[in-house]
Amino acid sequence: MTQNKKTILYIDLCGRLPYNTIISVAERVTDGEILWNDTTLTPYLFYRFAEDDMWDYVKPYLRPMDSMSPEEMQEHKDLYYQAPIYRSNGNAYRDVRKLETLHIDWLNSRHFDHRGLIEAGLALKATDEMYKEDCYD
């Protein structure tokens, strides 16, 4: 795996760490410990990936953007109205920086592949059963 791809994957996984993203780790023995397929990304495993060259074996299971349900599309669209409004000289402005963060956090929390990792071969397509809608906040 190239350094650029490792960087993209690392950045993506950092944002998904709080959301119990399911990852595939190719069966491999490291320091006498067997790592099996389909585990949840945790700080411990994340640390192990950082210290060992395991990036070639790690792939998160993500949902393609086109798998978003109509209800999810509406919820994602409604995030616009959650961004703070600032007023200046009689004009109203939304904080675009906060809006971008809201969108990325929402997409990460629902395990959507908003960076195109599936097409790049850095992630696997999640099955419908992997991430149930009732587990979202």
Predicted regions: what they are:
Residues M1-D137:
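Structural boundary micro-motifs
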